[in-house]
Amino acid sequence: MSKQDYYKTLGVTQSSDEREIKRAYKKLAMKYHPDRNPGNKNSEEKFKTIKEAYEILIDPKKRTAYDQYGHSAFEQGNSTGNNNTFTHSFSSNSDFSDIFGDVFGDIFGGTRKQKSERQGSDLRYDMTLTLEEAVRGTIKEIKIPTLQKCPTCYGYGTKTGTKPQFCPTCRGNGQIQMRKGFFTVQQTCPQCHGEGNFIRDPCRRCHGNGRIEISKTLSVKVPPGVDTNDKIRLNNEGEAGENGAMAGNLYVQINVKKHPIFEREENNLYCEVPISFSMAALGGEIEVPTLDGKVKLKIPCETQSGKLLRIRGRGVKSIRNNNRQGDLLCRIIVETPVNLNDLQKDLLYKLGESFNGFKGEKNSPKSKRFFEGVKRFFDDLTR
């Protein structure tokens, strides 16, 4: 029984281009696929014929041989005199993933299974800032080692003027089918490692990798208000992708150094302010530091050690809302005088006596409560 002309099988002509052949195959394959026509032997045979025609006409070498010698170009032991004869076997054991992979992928770019595009890896860079830099914002230059798209082969890994070779083992699918008893098992093609093609002539600069190692310098704009563990994302500044895929991102991890004066808690700053016991008792005014210079801080009379005094708007601007700014909280530390001379000691002794001794109820209410508590504690023990 003579075979039908492959062009007529697909409903195309000898002048039809690759795109028209793919569209025709897609339409017919979806119509006659065995999964859509279970138990229909005619559809199964029709699908097998359609697939056979497509696999010949989509391959430039096989199509040329068919145009010259017809079906005899693919028969074993043919006598056409052509040394470049083809042998080919066809199978109807194709599922819809074959059609979508071979046809839809081809129509929307590429020939059969292209070498996988893989997005580049993300990178991390640890940046240390002073508190002033973190609060005000800054611009830092950093140098990072990374992988960049090879400028010679544009990331494809092939020698100039060449292209990846179509894998003959899997016919560009990246998978091969092996029969084991009643089952058909798919496995990764051992020749192209699942890529569908392979590089016969690799680029000399990148040795076929498509990427080269470089060290690049970047300027990083740090916004005001960042804090330790914040991250700044630089899009597409990570490693270059493979086979034309997008590059990864670079994440700059912020670490703020400990400051000799200020401690930060979210948008508020804290500092310790030592004052004399006389100022703590009588009140007064003292200069305290801020990140923007010195300011006056009013000390109320009878201020106790550990009291927090707030200076509004002298903290850190919010990174999310620049109209909001934290406060500076001054923790008062009342210093006990040291290195006293005899006169000072005498004056302090007299001052203490004026308080009705060092347990004066009126002048030292906390001391009074403390010693009363101590007395009750020991009384309870002796009962």
UniProtKB/Swiss-Prot annotation:
Localization terms from the record: Cytoplasm
Residue positions binding Zn(2+) 1: 150, 153, 203, 206
Zn finger region (CR-type): 137-215
Main location: cytoplasm
Binding-site positions, Zn(2+) 2: 167, 170, 189, 192
UniProt entry keywords in alphabetical sequence: Chaperone, Cytoplasm, DNA replication, Metal-binding, Repeat, Stress response, Zinc, Zinc-finger
Top-level taxon: Bacteria
Biological processes annotated in GO: chaperone cofactor-dependent protein refolding; DNA replication; protein refolding; response to heat
CXXCXGXG motif repeat positions: 150-157, 167-174, 189-196, 203-210
Names of required cofactors: Zn(2+)
Cofactor details (free text): Binds 2 Zn(2+) ions per monomer.
PROSITE patterns for this protein: DNAJ_1, DNAJ_2, ZF_CR
Gene Ontology MF term list: ATP binding; heat shock protein binding; unfolded protein binding; zinc ion binding
GO cellular component: cytoplasm
Keyword Repeat (UniProt): yes
Occurrences of domain J (ranges): 5-70
InterPro entries: DnaJ, DnaJ_C, DnaJ_domain, DnaJ_domain_CS, HSP40/DnaJ_pept-bd, HSP_DnaJ_Cys-rich_dom, HSP_DnaJ_Cys-rich_dom_sf, J_dom_sf
Function: Participates actively in the response to hyperosmotic and heat shock by preventing the aggregation of stress-denatured proteins and by disaggregating proteins, also in an autonomous, DnaK-independent fashion. Unfolded proteins bind initially to DnaJ; upon interaction with the DnaJ-bound protein, DnaK hydrolyzes its bound ATP, resulting in the formation of a stable complex. GrpE releases ADP from DnaK; ATP binding to DnaK triggers the release of the substrate protein, thus completing the reaction cycle.
Known partners and oligomeric status: Homodimer.
Family from the record: Belongs to the DnaJ family.
Domain remark in the UniProt entry: The J domain is necessary and sufficient to stimulate DnaK ATPase activity. Zinc center 1 plays an important role in the autonomous, DnaK-independent chaperone activity of DnaJ. Zinc center 2 is essential for interaction with DnaK and for DnaJ activity.
Protein name, entry field: Chaperone protein DnaJ
